[in-house]
Amino acid sequence: MQSLSQLGPSEIFLVARREKPSTRAQLWFTGRLSFRQETNGIRLKNRVEFSPRPVPPNLIAAEKEEAKAVLTLFFKKQGLSNSLSSRLINKSDLFIDHLVSRLHSVHKARYLVGRELTTLEIRDSLIPYLEQLHEEHGDLLAELVVSFPDPPAEPRLVASSPVSVLPPRGDTDSAADTRKLRAVSRVSELDTEGALRPQTLYLLDLGLNLEQIKTITRKFAAFPYYSLDGKIKPVVEFLLDLGIPKSDIPTILCKRPQICGISLTDNLKPTMAFLETLGIDKNQWAKIISRFPAILTYSRQKLTSTVEFLSQTGLTEEQIGRILTRCPNIMSYSVEDKLRPTMEYFRSLNVDVAVLLHRCPQTFGLSIESNLKPVTEFFLEKGFGLDEIGIMISRYGALYTFSLKENVMPKWDYFQTMDYPKSELVKFPQFFGYSLQERIKPRYELVQRSGVRLLLNQVLSLSGIEFEKVVKKKMMKLVSNNVIAEQSSGGLL
C-alpha cells in the first residue's frame, strides 16, 4: 500500500478517481489510495480517510483559482501563448481538482489545524510537481492535463492533430466568462438580511467602490474568496502599521490583490527582512509598497537573481540598496529577457551601465526595439556619433524614457533655431527634460531680447530668481563694456 505522496506522477494518473469531486460539501482528506496487481491489469481501490474538519467552500474555490494561476504560469514558461494557455486551463477542471487534492495531501498537517496555504506556498508546492510531470511526459503534458484522469493520447495522434484536445474557442471563452461572472457576482451578493458580504463591506470601508472590487476580481478571480479575518484584514492592518495612508490601500489592492494571499509570518515579513539585507531602506517601506506592492509577492530566487545581476554590473551594495528603494519595480524585469539584453545594448554604445542604472534604473524597463533603438537612430541621423550619444545617455539616462515623437523631435526642431552648436546638447542633454513651452522658449526668448549670451545649461537649469540675476548681471556687464568701448573710441578721435 502506498500513500498519494509516495506515488510518482504517472501512478497518480492511473489511480485518480474518475468522478468529479463535489464542490458543495467537501472534507479534508489524506488522499491515501491502495491498489493491487491482478492478471487483467491494475485494479484500483480507493481508501479515503476523512477528518471531521470541513473545507469551507470559499477556500476550495480560492485554491482552485490559485492552482489555475500556477498552471497558467507554468504553461507560459513552456512557451505557450496566453490564448492557448487559457484554452487549456478552461478544459482542465478535473486536473485542477487533482492539484487542489494534492495540496491537501502534502500539507495535511496544516489543514488539520485550520491554517490556510499562502499563494507562495501553493506555488512552491505545485511548480516542482508540474516540472516532474513535464519531465516525464514532455510535449504530451498539455493533452495529459486536458484528458485527466484518462491517460493522454498516443504521440502519433497528437502529431496528426496537435490541437485536437482543445475545445472550440467559443466554448472555452464561454466557460471562462461564466467563471469570471460567478466570481464578480459574488462581490455584490446579498445575504438573507439583504447585506453585502463582510469582505465587500470591509473593502468599501477602506475606500474602494464596488466597481473597483469587481475590476480586481476580473483580473484575479480568487480575490473575492479570500477570508476576511484570515487573509485580507491582517495584511491591510499590517500595511497601515507600516505608515501607509488608508487612502493608498485601494491603489495597492488594485495593483496587486495577490498580496492578501501572502502569509504575514511565513512569507511577507521574511521577504521584507531579506530585502532589507539587500540594502532596501526599512524606513521607506510605506513609499516602496505604495509604489510597487508586487515586490512583496516575488520569490526569494527571483529577488536574488536580480540583485546578483545588479552586482555584476559593478554596482556597490549601497548603490543597489538605493536603486531598490527608489525603483523597486526593477525587480519585475526578467534578468535574461530584459535586464541583460538592455545592458549589452548600452555597452555597445560605450555607456557605463552601472552609472546609468544608478541614475535612471527605469531605463532598463524599456523595449530595445520600440524605445531605445529609435532614439539612438534619431540622433545618428542628426549627425551625432555613437560616442557622443553614449556620453549623452551617461549624463542623462532619462533621455531614453521620453517619447521620440512627442518630446525629443519637437525640442530638437526648436533647438535648430537656437544659436547653439550640437556640442551643447552633448554637454547638456538635460535640455530634453525641460518643458518646451513653459521653460525653453520663454527663457531663450528673454536671453535673445536682452542681447546677452548664456550657456545652454545656464538658460535652463537655474532657478527663476538665479536666472534673472544672471541675465541682469550679463546685461550690466554688456552695457559697461559698451560704455568703455565708446569712451575709448572717443579718446582716439
Curated annotation (Swiss-Prot):
Disruption phenotype: Pale-green phenotype, reduced growth and altered structure of chloroplasts. Defect in photosystem II (PSII) function with strongly reduced levels of core subunits, including psbE, psbF, psbL and psbJ cotranscribed from psbEFLJ. Enhanced osmotic stress tolerance and altered sugar responses during seedling establishment.
Top-level taxon in the UniProt lineage: Eukaryota
Record keywords: Chloroplast, DNA-binding, Plastid, Transcription, Transcription regulation, Transcription termination, Transit peptide
GO molecular function annotations of the record: sequence-specific double-stranded DNA binding
Protein's job: Transcription termination factor required for processing and steady-state levels of plastid transcripts. Involved also in chloroplast transcriptional pausing, a general feature of chloroplast genes. Specifically and positively regulates the transcription of chloroplast psbEFLJ encoding for photosystem II (PSII) core subunits psbE, psbF, psbL and psbJ; causes the plastid-encoded RNA polymerase (PEP) complex to pause at psbEFLJ by binding to the +30 to +51 region of double-stranded DNA, and recruits additional pTAC6 to the transcriptionally paused region of psbEFLJ.
The keyword Chloroplast is assigned to this record: yes
Higher taxonomy: Eukaryota, Viridiplantae, Streptophyta, Embryophyta, Tracheophyta
Assembly information from the UniProt record: Interacts with pTAC6.
Residue interval of the organelle targeting sequence: 1-43
Extent of the signal sequence: none
Localization annotation: Plastid, Chloroplast
Membrane-spanning intervals of the chain: none
Keyword Protein biosynthesis: no
Full protein name: Transcription termination factor MTERF5, chloroplastic
PANTHER family: CGI-12 PROTEIN-RELATED, TRANSCRIPTION TERMINATION FACTOR MTERF5, CHLOROPLASTIC
